[in-house]
Amino acid sequence: MKKSTKLIVALLVVVAALAVTYRLMHRVPSADLEANAQMQQLITDAGCLRCHTSTPDLPFYANVPVAGKVVMEDVSKAYRAFDMTQMEKALKAGQPLNPVDLAKVEKVILDGKMPQAKYYLVHWGASFNDAKKKVALDWVKNHRMGMYEDISVAPEFANEPIRPIADSIAVDVRKVVLGNLLYHDTRLSADNTVSCATCHGLDTGGVDNKQYSEGVGGQFGGVNAPTVYNAAYNFVQFWDGRAGTLAEQAAGPPLNPVEMACESFDQIISKLAEDKNFVLAFNEVYSDGLSEKNITNAIQEFEKTLLTPNSRFDRYLKGQKDAITENEMAGYELFKKYDCATCHVGEILGGQSYELIGVQHDYFADRQAEMTEEDNGRFKQTQAERDRHRFKVPGLRNIELTAPYFDGCIMATMDDAIRAMAKYQLGIELPQEEVDKIVAFFRTLTGEYKGQLLTNKNENTL
């Protein structure tokens, strides 16, 4: 074969290879596919499920000594940060996705962080070009739009990861009245000294502003009291998620030996039954009378009314441009820039997922305090190692009123909490100017209760 012929053949082979590579790199899911199927193809082609799952599909070079170590480190970090298993199942089943999953996927695509270059340079076609990004981001937007019922958001903010709080949630007013009475009733405790409001005061931001709440007999629990305001928006209750509903949550403290210390709900019912007027009112609403189920149901119904809408930031999202300042708006942009809005999403800026504390640095080692059972977080309930130190993400509504912060309350100020999150979750140190702007944004999240700006009678001590 002549040299010229060989050269032509070689060039044809190169051109063919380049054509195949180009098609792989620019392949976009068919428009004939349903939207979820398009997204499923994108994350499959990008290799997301090779790392972000408990059963990673490792590439052949994972067995190569040097490369294998890097692969295993990347897989471990990926799975710790984001398990995409449930997202994949939801896509296949055509079910709604968790808003946190949407926010995480959206952010890495916008930032161009995933897949990493060291992956797509080996796996041609894994990278996201502009066409793929458009398909993915349109899918996120449409899915998010269908997730929220609120239609009062200004059009330009319709795709924001944060939504305004509703003015109200549908409730049975008769049950609310009973729930209000029970919420403030110390007879739910063994020694008649502690009520729900003792640790979740409605005049103290829905918390008690203490590191640990004090129960019967001067005993102290192992975590701080999360705010009761807007708790109806949490996907589960308690830091470790052991209660699926507000009613289940309401059943916990009365029987907790530290908090209210009752032996059973029969003990509570026997005390309430002595109050003839209360029993009469209760029986008018619940035909089967006093019971654990009915008591906790009434408290749940009352807690659904503990919403704090109409914050300045809510008004901004609804189109009132002068509701927040430029400095506060800059704080919100930083909040999104630093991935805060990938976990602190939705109406209450949180409460939609369990997340690991200490992604980049060991938070508990630096804390220099003895580990407790509470520090295990979700692991307490599941015994799954991945859930160790993983907690329900707290909502940030009214955050200026709810200090101290974190489950162990070792962060006294918003400034401290922001710096800690930057260090342990992102591995960075923020300049004071940026911290101040994020704090300013946080102050726009204080809402109204019963038409009045929420305040805290302890504010002078915070």
Predicted regions and their residues:
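Axial heme c-ligation environment in periplasmic c-type cytochrome domains
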Residues: 56-61, 81-102, 107-132, 228, ...
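Short runs of predominantly hydrophobic/aromatic residues within well-ordered alpha helices
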Residues: 102, 225, 292-296, 393, ...
